[in-house]
Amino acid sequence: MKRHKKTLRMAIFLFQLLWGIYATEVQAQETPAMIDQPIIWTENREQLILQYAQTHYGLSETHIVPQAVVVHWTAGDTWESAYWTFYHEDRGDGTLNVASHFIVDRDGTIYRLTEETALNRHAIGYNWCAIGIENVGGVDGEEDLTQEQLEANVQLIRYLHQKYPTILYVFGHYQQDIARDSGLYIEHVDGYHSIKSDPGPTFMRGLRLNLENDGLIFYPEKF
């Protein structure tokens, strides 16, 4: 009996060891390569985030439970220009600066700028629950995002969905109005709204075709 118990314990140990190795390998395969390039993050930024969340959402939070991914373009031609736009804490008037969680360069390189659950200002009405991905391009409103960016976005969104099962929705910034059907939109400031065209229907169609079987909800691509 003692011998049997010893054998059983050894079998359980080996299973746990092998499962740990397998899980680590799977995680490594599913996590896309990315470069951490943090923007400045201080107590002052946290305070500005808190003020923004209280004013616009009635929430006293600086972090989110991710429920959506909002896809953008930068309207610029380098990742550095977008990075330095997001880098500082305020917009010069003392209000919270815009920022996104990720930037994807033209060649598909992914830069992570903040914690994935930080509350960043990138999409009116959804910042309290959405992760933002900025794609370099869209200068003068041209739909010019690359295949490499599409593939990187697919990998990144799939990784985020696996890491945060609370994520159900993926939409482009220009789809912000129809995305209100999700029930996620909150805005307490009257008239606070903007019209967007990024990242365009072609890119969003590509994302939908690659990810619609992953249990994510998309919206019609047309403007």
Annotate each predicted stretch with a short phrase.
Residues 2-11:
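Bacterial N-terminal signal peptides that target proteins for export
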Residues 29-45, 139-223:
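Basic/polar, cationic surfaces and motifs that engage anionic cell-wall
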Residues 24-123:
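N-terminal catalytic cores of peptidoglycan-degrading enzymes
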Residues 11-20:
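Bacterial N-terminal signal peptides
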Residues 117-119, 132-144:
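Substrate-binding clefts and substrate-entry loops adjacent to catalytic sites
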Residues 124-129:
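Flexible, solvent-exposed short loops/turns enriched in glycine
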